[in-house]
């Protein structure tokens, strides 16, 4: 049942900071979402502004909301992930995809390359498979998702096999070399127009716990007592932390990308912490990247960004466009 509010006060009616093509710019229409996913009705409640919402501190509510969004906006009838795996906010994931489309368009006379000719590698796809779902359903791109976790790979396979709209468009590969990012999953004949990645942010489990507690203390300081200090969006160890944290992870990716310099148009990775950019830029300079771009994205109060780099020269770019982007 969708709740009715007597309070017309609203904090914000539109998420105007999101990408112009992002379908999640407006406030969630919970009536429509509940039609797509009836079980969502059990989680709908009124927030402090009198607007319909869900308890984002409740992992089950977050997962059910994601299921409804993926059904309603992207035609995905079945979507489920095991407990404890990353359950990401859909609007932010969609933003990355749309800005990646703009990145390709900037090299293609402003026209977004669409269809199965565009190949994308999602490094660390996770069990949720969200980036490939959005990228394929929005632009028709073909995806390979890699992950070190066999459960994540199996879950992606199940999601794809359970949705006819995704079959043949998304494949998941197990990364058996945990210290590698491209080696082991990038096959000899693979050519990718894009790579994308949401890298582990923290340097260790203890650092992650400290950061979570700090944020929780900040929430309590604002007298928001309904929040709980839980990882409401989940995440396994490989999804949340690694040696060297975000800066170390992306720098390793940059170094490894040199081996695939002429087999990818744009390598990209999210960078959550602005302070990590200088180290990443230094590594990009060291490896001789020809083009480097930093694209900022705003999502509510949060500013995020991704770094993109390419090794292609002008002649290679022209050849790529003429041979791979003509639908």
Curated annotation (Swiss-Prot):
Gene Ontology terms: biological process: rRNA base methylation
Catalytic activity: adenosine(1618) in 23S rRNA + S-adenosyl-L-methionine = N(6)-methyladenosine(1618) in 23S rRNA + S-adenosyl-L-homocysteine + H(+)
Gene3D superfamilies: Vaccinia Virus protein VP39
Presence of keyword Methyltransferase: yes
Predominant localisation class: cytoplasm
Role description: Specifically methylates the adenine in position 1618 of 23S rRNA.
Gene that encodes it: rlmF
Compartment(s) of residence: Cytoplasm
Biological source species: Marinomonas sp. (strain MWYL1)
Family listed: Belongs to the methyltransferase superfamily. METTL16/RlmF family.
EC number: 2.1.1.181
Record flagged with keyword rRNA processing: yes
Protein name: Ribosomal RNA large subunit methyltransferase F
GO cellular component: cytoplasm
